[in-house]
Every structure is written in structure tokens, then in C-alpha cells.
């Protein structure tokens, strides 16, 4: 441990073996809170390398319980969080709608650290059992195309380090790791990052971990695809990386102001979610979610492009099927 800390203090990248040892220490609680704080801050100041992020994710996945093999090309749209902008739960609402359209969504997430409402906070307040056991998760995913994997259940290091990480008042390598360590190993991912500079690193990390199709995005400083600003995207397609910018025009949607997406409580996010699912949400809320669903449809080859994905989603919302689908998910999660 001393050697690893000294290397980090001198701003040297750790090799794969050092990262594996370090995260094994963290998993086995062989690191004191003081040491963990020093490690996270040193990594942050140095800048986490692609190889460090990939090796840490691989180590955490090796130690995580394996829920089951679904036999499906699962999709996740978990983001890093940490943008601090306190918006509605765009990705979680998008996952619920996408699953109601038949996309197999294995949503990996946790409670909020920097916002009013994380994915677990929203789903729990909607009535979903966020701590599904193996049988419940498998059945819910099979019957509703939606399953929620509460990160602390599968990665104890996340749960035990959460209070310390919150006290650091900064993003850490754990923000980057969250979207990479879904125990069900999805093959398709839409991943939002809190900083545009992470887009290339994270899409390469997904590729290294075996993901086949992905898009890593940062929209106007948020870890989402947005309509109020340019969204920078790095796409993994046919084993190649494509880098480009997206605007509202690419979705054939109008722009909206960021302020219209910001909330003050989890209750506001819950109401926004229910309104969107019933096709009576604010346009600013609905359209940004639609853009994210469209991207999931595009990545899964259900839509030939983003504009077609938008049209498909808007037509689906008119049926109000997503709201009925949520009730099914709630019931199955407790069955």
C-alpha cells in the first residue's frame, strides 16, 4: 500500500497489477478511511488513466456476485452523475420508456451523491423495489424488459465508501466506475459523463470491457443528451470510435433552456416522471427524455437514425403505455 500511495503522490500512473491490488484492498476493507481519501484525491489530482479505470472496473466485476445469465443483448444507460446541475432523472425515465418499447434495459444505479434525485431515489419513490433479489430481478427483466441493479448490493465498496466520498466534495474514480461495472454485463450502453474530456476515455474503457455498441455523451456540462446545448458524443460502432457533436436539430426537436430541467426535490422528479409517462409532461421535460430514448433505439438498431427514434418514441408516448408499464414493473419488482 505504501508503494502505491507513493507512486500516486508522485503523479505516476499505476500499472494493472497495482490497480488490481489496490482495489482488492479496498474491496476487502484493508484500507483505512484516511488512506482511501488520500488515494481518491491523489488519483483525482493526477488524473485517472484509461488503463487505471479499465483495470479497476475489471477487478470490481471479478469480485461482484453474478446475478444470472439473461441470454439477451442487454442495454444500460447509467451515467457518472457528478454534474451538480440537479436535473430531472432523464436517463432513468428514458430507461422506463425504452423498456416499454421492448428494449431489454438492465439499469445499474444508486442513490444521489451530488443531485436531489439519483436513479435509486426516483425508482424507490415511484414504488419500485430497488433491492430485488436474484429471482425478482430475473423475472422482472424477463416479463417487463426492465431490471434495476442497485449498485451497493453488488459492490460493497461503493456502499461503504459513500459517506467518505460525499465528504470529499469532488468527483472521484468511483464516478467513472459506476457505469462500467453493471454485473449483468450489458453489450449496449448509452453513458453520460460529467466532463466532456472523459468521453473518449470512457468509450475506450467500454470497448476494453467487451461492450459492442456504445455512445458516451456530455451535453452542455450534464451527463445526458440535451437540447439546450451541444452534446459531444463518442460512439463505438463496428469496433471503431466515431466522435461528433449533436444539437437539437439532429433530433428534429426544438431547443429548451436548462433551467426548465432543474428540480428542487425527488418529489418533483417523481411527478415529472409520471407526467411524461402519461404523455402530459412539460414539453421541455418530455423532449429531452425522448432524445435519450431515440438514442437507445438507434444504438440497438431499432431505429435507423436519431430522428426516426424520436418519431417512434413520440408515437409510443401517445398510447400512454409507458405509464401502464411502470405499474407492471412495480408489481413484478415485489413479486
From Swiss-Prot:
<comment type="subunit">
    <text>Homodimer.</text>
</comment>
<comment type="similarity">
    <text>Belongs to the anthranilate phosphoribosyltransferase family.</text>
</comment>
<dbReference type="InterPro" id="IPR017459">
    <property type="entry name" value="Glycosyl_Trfase_fam3_N_dom"/>
</dbReference>
<dbReference type="GO" id="GO:0000287">
    <property type="term" value="F:magnesium ion binding"/>
</dbReference>
<dbReference type="GO" id="GO:0005829">
    <property type="term" value="C:cytosol"/>
</dbReference>
<dbReference type="Pfam" id="PF00591">
    <property type="entry name" value="Glycos_transf_3"/>
</dbReference>
<dbReference type="Pfam" id="PF02885">
    <property type="entry name" value="Glycos_trans_3N"/>
</dbReference>
<keyword id="KW-0808">Transferase</keyword>
<feature type="binding site">
    <location>
        <position position="87"/>
    </location>
    <ligand>
        <name>5-phospho-alpha-D-ribose 1-diphosphate</name>
    </ligand>
</feature>
<keyword id="KW-0328">Glycosyltransferase</keyword>
<feature type="binding site">
    <location>
        <position position="224"/>
    </location>
    <ligand>
        <name>Mg(2+) 2</name>
    </ligand>
</feature>
<keyword id="KW-0479">Metal-binding</keyword>
<dbReference type="GO" id="GO:0000162">
    <property type="term" value="P:L-tryptophan biosynthetic process"/>
</dbReference>
<feature type="binding site">
    <location>
        <position position="165"/>
    </location>
    <ligand>
        <name>anthranilate 2</name>
    </ligand>
</feature>
<dbReference type="InterPro" id="IPR035902">
    <property type="entry name" value="Nuc_phospho_transferase"/>
</dbReference>
<feature type="binding site">
    <location>
        <position position="224"/>
    </location>
    <ligand>
        <name>Mg(2+) 1</name>
    </ligand>
</feature>
<dbReference type="InterPro" id="IPR000312">
    <property type="entry name" value="Glycosyl_Trfase_fam3"/>
</dbReference>
<feature type="binding site">
    <location>
        <position position="79"/>
    </location>
    <ligand>
        <name>anthranilate 1</name>
    </ligand>
</feature>
<dbReference type="InterPro" id="IPR036320">
    <property type="entry name" value="Glycosyl_Trfase_fam3_N_dom_sf"/>
</dbReference>
<feature type="binding site">
    <location>
        <begin position="82"/>
        <end position="83"/>
    </location>
    <ligand>
        <name>5-phospho-alpha-D-ribose 1-diphosphate</name>
    </ligand>
</feature>
<dbReference type="InterPro" id="IPR005940">
    <property type="entry name" value="Anthranilate_Pribosyl_Tfrase"/>
</dbReference>
<feature type="binding site">
    <location>
        <position position="79"/>
    </location>
    <ligand>
        <name>5-phospho-alpha-D-ribose 1-diphosphate</name>
    </ligand>
</feature>
<keyword id="KW-0028">Amino-acid biosynthesis</keyword>
<feature type="binding site">
    <location>
        <begin position="89"/>
        <end position="92"/>
    </location>
    <ligand>
        <name>5-phospho-alpha-D-ribose 1-diphosphate</name>
    </ligand>
</feature>
<protein>
    <recommendedName>
        <fullName>Anthranilate phosphoribosyltransferase</fullName>
        <ecNumber>2.4.2.18</ecNumber>
    </recommendedName>
</protein>
<keyword id="KW-0822">Tryptophan biosynthesis</keyword>
<comment type="pathway">
    <text>Amino-acid biosynthesis; L-tryptophan biosynthesis; L-tryptophan from chorismate: step 2/5.</text>
</comment>
<feature type="binding site">
    <location>
        <position position="119"/>
    </location>
    <ligand>
        <name>5-phospho-alpha-D-ribose 1-diphosphate</name>
    </ligand>
</feature>
<feature type="binding site">
    <location>
        <position position="223"/>
    </location>
    <ligand>
        <name>Mg(2+) 2</name>
    </ligand>
</feature>
<dbReference type="GO" id="GO:0004048">
    <property type="term" value="F:anthranilate phosphoribosyltransferase activity"/>
</dbReference>
<comment type="function">
    <text>Catalyzes the transfer of the phosphoribosyl group of 5-phosphorylribose-1-pyrophosphate (PRPP) to anthranilate to yield N-(5'-phosphoribosyl)-anthranilate (PRA).</text>
</comment>
<keyword id="KW-0057">Aromatic amino acid biosynthesis</keyword>
<feature type="binding site">
    <location>
        <position position="91"/>
    </location>
    <ligand>
        <name>Mg(2+) 1</name>
    </ligand>
</feature>
<feature type="binding site">
    <location>
        <begin position="107"/>
        <end position="115"/>
    </location>
    <ligand>
        <name>5-phospho-alpha-D-ribose 1-diphosphate</name>
    </ligand>
</feature>
<keyword id="KW-0460">Magnesium</keyword>
Amino acid at each position: 500500500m505504501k508503494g502505491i500511495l507513493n507512486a500516486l503522490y508522485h503523479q505516476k500512473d499505476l500499472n494493472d497489477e497495482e490497480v488490481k491490488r489496490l482495489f482488492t484492498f479496498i474491496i476487502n476493507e484493508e484500507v483505512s478511511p484516511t488512506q482511501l481519501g488520500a488515494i481518491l484525491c491523489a488519483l483525482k489530482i493526477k488524473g485517472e488513466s484509461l488503463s487505471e479505470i479499465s483495470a479497476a472496473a475489471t477487478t470490481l466485476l471479478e469480485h461482484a456476485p453474478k446475478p444470472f445469465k439473461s441470454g439477451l443483448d442487454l442495454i444500460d444507460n447509467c451515467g457518472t452523475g457528478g454534474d451538480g446541475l440537479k436535473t430531472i432523472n432523464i436517463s432513468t425515465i428514458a430507461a422506463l420508456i425504452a423498456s416499454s418499447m421492448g428494449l431489454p434495459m438492465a439499469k445499474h444505479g444508486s442513490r444521489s451523491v451530488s443531485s436531489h434525485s439519483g436513479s435509486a431515489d426516483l425508482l424507490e419513490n415511484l414504488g419500485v423495489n430497488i433491492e430485488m433479489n436474484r429471482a425478482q430481478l430475473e423475472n422482472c427483466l424477463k416479463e417487463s424488459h426492465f431490471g434495476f441493479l442497485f449498485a451497493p448490493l453488488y459492490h460493497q465498496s461503493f456502499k461503504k465508501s459513500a459517506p467518505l466520498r460525499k465528504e470529499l466534495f469532488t468527483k472521484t474514480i468511483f464516478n467513472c466506475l459506476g457505469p462500467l461495472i453493471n454485473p449483468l454485463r450489458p453489450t449496449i450502453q448509452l453513458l453520460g459523463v460529467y466532463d466532456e474530456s472523459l468521453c473518449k476515455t470512457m468509450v475506450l474503457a467500454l470497448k476494453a470491457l467487451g461492450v459492442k455498441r456504445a455512445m458516451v455523451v456530455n451535453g452542455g456540462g450534464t451527463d445526458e443528451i440535451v437540447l439546450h446545448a451541444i452534446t459531444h458524443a463518442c460512439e463505438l460502432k463496428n469496433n471503431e470510435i466515431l466522435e461528433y457533436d449533436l444539437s437539437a436539430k439532429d433530433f428534429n426537436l426544438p431547443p429548451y433552456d436548462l433551467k426548465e430541467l432543474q428540480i428542487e426535490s425527488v418529489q418533483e422528479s417523481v411527478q415529472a416522471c409520471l407526467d411524461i409517462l402519461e404523455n402530459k409532461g412539460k414539453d421541455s421535460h418530455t423532449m429531452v427524455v425522448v432524445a435519450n430514448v431515440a438514442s437507445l433505439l438507434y444504438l440497438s438498431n431499432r431505429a435507423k437514425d436519431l430522428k426516426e427514434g424520436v418519431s417512434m418514441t413520440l408515437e409510443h408516448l401517445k398510447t400512454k403505455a409507458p405509464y401502464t408499464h411502470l405499474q407492471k414493473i412495480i408489481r413484478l419488482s415485489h413479486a
